[in-house]
C-alpha cells in the first residue's frame, strides 16, 4: 500500500484546529482527506459568548452539509469517513466558559462539545496555564474534572502548567491529552512539554498531538516539513506509536487582531507572548 493509499484508507483526525471557519476551509479539509477535527469554539469567551459561537457554528455546518457533519460520537466519525466528509467536534481551549457553574459542563456536552482545555496560558478557576506560576488544580477544578469525566468531555492540557497538568492526569478517571504541543527537548518554550511530561501522560493512558505551529518548532518561522517530522519522531520515541497523533493548530484565515486577542490575558489585558510572523512550515499551505 502506497502512502497515498494508506492516507485515503485511514481515519485521519486533527487534534486541534483554530482556523477561521468558512466554506473554503471545509473544502481544504475534504481535499486533504481529513476525517474529523477538534475545532475551537471558545478561548477567552464566557458562557453566553461561547453559546453564541456554537449557534453560529451550527448554522455554518448546516449551510455546508455537503462537506461537513457534526460529531457527537465515534459513530459520527465513522459516518464522516463513509460519506467522504469531515466531522466537526466542538472544543474549548479554556474552561473559562464554565464560569463558576459545574452544571454548565453538561450543558455544553449537550451542545456538542467533546473536549475542553483546562486553562489557556493563565490562571482560571480550574487551575493554572503555562505562562504563570503554577498553583496546581483547584478544588473547584477537581469537581470540573469529575463532571467532565461523567458526561464524556475530554480534558486537554496543551496550554496548561506542569503542576496543574500532572494533577489533572492523576485526578481524571479517563484518559486526557495534550491535543497540540511540541517537545521542549527540541526547543525550550513555555508552551512545549518536557520529556518527563510527555512520558507521564503516555504512561497514564493519555494522547499527545504534535503541532506544526512554527513559533514552537526548533527553527521557528524557518521550519520546514522535515522539522515537523523530526518533532513527531522525537515525541514518538518517548510516548510510543499508540499515544501519538497530530494536532496541527492551524490558524488559516485569521489576521493580526485575532493573534493580538489570543496573546493577551483574557483577550485584552497584559501581553503573554508575541508570536511575530505566523506561517506554516515550508511546504504546507
Features from the language model and the residues they span:
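Distinct, well-ordered alpha-helical segments
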Residues: 26, 101-105, 161-174
Amino acid at each position: 500500500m502506497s502512502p497515498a493509499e494508506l492516507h485515503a484508507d485511514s481515519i485521519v483526525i486533527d487534534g486541534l484546529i483554530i482556523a477561521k471557519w468558512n466554506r473554503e476551509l471545509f473544502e481544504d479539509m475534504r481535499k486533504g482527506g481529513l476525517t474529523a477535527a477538534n475545532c475551537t469554539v471558545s478561548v477567552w469567551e464566557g458562557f453566553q459568548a461561547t453559546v453564541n459561537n456554537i449557534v453560529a457554528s451550527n448554522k455554518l455546518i448546516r449551510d455546508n452539509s455537503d462537506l461537513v457533519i457534526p460529531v457527537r460520537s465515534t459513530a459520527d466519525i465513522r459516518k464522516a469517513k463513509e460519506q467522504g466528509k469531515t466531522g466537526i467536534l466542538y472544543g474549548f481551549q479554556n474552561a473559562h466558559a464554565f464560569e463558576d457553574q459545574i452544571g454548565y459542563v453538561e450543558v455544553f456536552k449537550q451542545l456538542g462539545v467533546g473536549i475542553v482545555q483546562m486553562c489557556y496560558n493563565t490562571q482560571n478557576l480550574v487551575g493554572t496555564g503555562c505562562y504563570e506560576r503554577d498553583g496546581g488544580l483547584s478544588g473547584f477544578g477537581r469537581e470540573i474534572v469529575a463532571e467532565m469525566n461523567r458526561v464524556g468531555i475530554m480534558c486537554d492540557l496543551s496550554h496548561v502548567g506542569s503542576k496543574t497538568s500532572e494533577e489533572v492526569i492523576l485526578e481524571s478517571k479517563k484518559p486526557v491529552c495534550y491535543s497540540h504541543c511540541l517537545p521542549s527537548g527540541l526547543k525550550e518554550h513555555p508552551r512545549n512539554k518536557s520529556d518527563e511530561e510527555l512520558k507521564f501522560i503516555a504512561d497514564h493512558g493519555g494522547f499527545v498531538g504534535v503541532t506544526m505551529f512554527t513559533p514552537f518548532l526548533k527553527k521557528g518561522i524557518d521550519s520546514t516539513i522535515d522539522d515537523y517530522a523530526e518533532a513527531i519522531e522525537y515525541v514518538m520515541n518517548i510516548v510510543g506509536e499508540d499515544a501519538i497523533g497530530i494536532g496541527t493548530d492551524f490558524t488559516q484565515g485569521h489576521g493580526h487582531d485575532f493573534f493580538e486577542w489570543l496573546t493577551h490575558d483574557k483577550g485584552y489585558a497584559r501581553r503573554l507572548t508575541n508570536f511575530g510572523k505566523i506561517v506554516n512550515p515550508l511546504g504546507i499551505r
